[in-house]
């Protein structure tokens, strides 16, 4: 990221002027759509990445936009001239400006974050970026906890709240005015024609969302750090902000509590916070009364401090021993696993019954079948049907599509405690593939399988299945045990497409 700081060329007078590179540095536009920057940030899937831009953006079009921007006395290019000269839709200009503004603002923030991490000697581990790396942590920690708060992060309805949140991070007033202008133009365009696509880039909206969440987490972790005796360097990666302590004092006045009383609620060394997919969970070993206090705390934090209407129904208190926790496409719950140990002292032997608490992570089979039914792989009851829209493709293309989907699901749900539901999903996809091919060749499923043989179904074996089938025979007891082993992979950076499918 330090390499791209030179493109901005900030000096002492323009250190916070984000509009300067936007209007006077031409090559920052080309930098935003440079494929090399994407390759350098493979571990950040949303950073400078959008498949549609590769087809309609080029250096020549970018240069023409810059020249027209310099020639115009007003910021808005007339729709008629824009379509006539560029041949693009009238929201093209706003998409260009929004993504460039996000790129310019993100670079200084990323540099500050990187310097903060380097100053604390925090080790960088790419394995921790995997979604599956969270589950071993939860298996080790949640077994000692009683309750979990499952909270849906609220998002402000009025865009002015986002501007106010960003105001404490950006000192440049002109950049904030331009930022507010883009947001209100976005609202006007959206209200004018709801069928039009968003004129703002998803990266720009994602930057706003991350700033909003980071502001909330900085307050929460600040109070958590001040109240805890266990010092941690992970809390030091958040950015310092202007008037932070003044805002904290105002925050306490709203709650009508003194500092010690609020910290008394937060003093809990057995407290773990995990944020994921627009939600966060707070696991702790508390009583129901304290969990209700936590619920009251979060509701008032969002309503009084961030001016966001936050209903208490969005905060669910789950008891791990009774309720299931929906987490990253898994249903997690605590299960009592009885363990009998035979002990012998001298001539007397006796049995000791021990109960071990184990965290089970299962596949939500009903929601997965609902997603498959929506994509026309099966009906609502889970009975496979043919994929009619794929019959125009070649046999190899159809087979490769089904194999890729099946392997991705097996890869993502390899950590399931019960593989029965996983085998059911794979069965649906296999039979759907056979029915699709049989429909294409105008044959029955039985006749098609008889002609093709069992080689078709072997294509659905995953890599780990192929290795196990070579080492152990399927009838071997050791092989059966290995097939029940839970495996967490460290290369999963995305949620599966069937998770939270809407």
Swiss-Prot record:
Q: Which InterPro entries match?
A: Domain_X, Maturase_MatK, Maturase_MatK_N
Q: What is its main location?
A: plastid
Enumerate the Gene Ontology biological process terms. mRNA processing; RNA splicing; tRNA processing
Arranged from A to Z, the UniProt key words for this protein are: Chloroplast, mRNA processing, Plastid, RNA-binding, tRNA processing
Q: Name one GO molecular function term.
A: RNA binding
Cell compartments where the protein resides: Plastid, Chloroplast
Provide GO CC annotations from the record: chloroplast
Family, similarity comment: Belongs to the intron maturase 2 family. MatK subfamily.
The function of this protein is: Usually encoded in the trnK tRNA gene intron. Probably assists in splicing its own and other chloroplast group II introns.
Q: What protein am I looking at?
A: Maturase K
Which species is the source of this protein? Brassica campestris (Field mustard)
């Amino acid at each position: 990221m330090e390499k791209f700081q030179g493109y901005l060329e900030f000096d002492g007078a323009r250190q916070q002027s984000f509009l300067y590179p936007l209007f006077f540095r031409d090559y920052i536009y080309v930098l935003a759509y440079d494929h090399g920057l994407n390759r350098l940030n493979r571990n950040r899937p949303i950073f400078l990445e959008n498949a549609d831009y590769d087809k309609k953006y080029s250096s020549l079009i970018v240069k023409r936009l810059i020249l027209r921007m310099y020639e115009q006395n007003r910021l808005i290019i007339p729709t008629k001239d824009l379509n006539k000269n560029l041949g693009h839709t009238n929201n093209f200009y706003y998409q260009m400006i929004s993504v460039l503004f996000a790129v310019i603002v993100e670079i200084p923030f990323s540099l500050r974050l990187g310097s903060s991490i380097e100053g604390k000697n925090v080790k960088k581990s790419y394995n921790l970026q995997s979604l599956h790396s969270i589950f071993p942590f939860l298996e080790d920690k949640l077994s000692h906890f009683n309750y979990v708060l499952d909270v849906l992060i609220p998002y402000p309805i009025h865009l002015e709240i986002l501007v106010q949140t960003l105001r404490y991070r950006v000192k440049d007033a002109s950049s904030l005015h331009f930022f507010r202008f883009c947001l209100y133009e976005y609202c006007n365009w959206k209200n004018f024609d709801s069928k039009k696509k968003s004129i703002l880039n998803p990266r720009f909206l994602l930057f706003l969302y991350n700033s909003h969440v980071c502001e909330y987490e900085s307050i929460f972790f600040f109070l958590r750090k001040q109240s805890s005796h266990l010092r941690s360097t992970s809390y030091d990666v958040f950015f310092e902000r202007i008037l932070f302590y003044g805002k904290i004092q105002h925050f306490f006045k709203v709650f009508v509590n003194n500092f010690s009383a609020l910290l008394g609620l937060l003093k809990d060394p057995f407290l773990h916070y995990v944020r994921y997919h627009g939600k966060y969970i707070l696991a702790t070993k508390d009583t129901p009364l304290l969990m209700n206090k936590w619920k009251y705390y979060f509701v008032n934090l969002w309503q009084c401090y961030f001016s966001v209407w936050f209903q208490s129904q969005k905060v669910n208190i789950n008891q791990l021993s009774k309720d299931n926790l929906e987490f990253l496409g898994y249903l997690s719950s605590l299960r009592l696993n009885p363990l009998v140990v035979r002990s012998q002292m001298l001539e007397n032997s006796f049995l000791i019954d021990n109960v071990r608490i184990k965290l089970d992570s299962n596949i939500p089979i009903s929601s997965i079948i609902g997603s498959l039914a929506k994509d026309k792989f099966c009906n609502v009851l889970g009975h496979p049907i043919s994929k009619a829209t794929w019959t125009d493709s070649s046999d190899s293309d159809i087979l490769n599509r089904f194999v890729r989907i099946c392997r991705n699901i097996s890869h993502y749900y390899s950590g399931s405690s019960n593989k029965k539901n996983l085998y059911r999903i794979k069965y649906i996809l296999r039979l759907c593939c056979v029915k699709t091919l049989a429909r294409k060749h105008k044959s029955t499923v039985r006749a098609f399988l008889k002609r093709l043989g069992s080689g078709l179904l072997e294509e659905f074996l995953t890599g780990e299945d192929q290795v196990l089938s070579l080492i152990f025979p399927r009838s071997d007891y050791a092989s059966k045990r290995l097939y029940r082993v839970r495996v967490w992979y460290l290369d999963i950076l995305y949620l599966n497409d069937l998770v939270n499918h809407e």
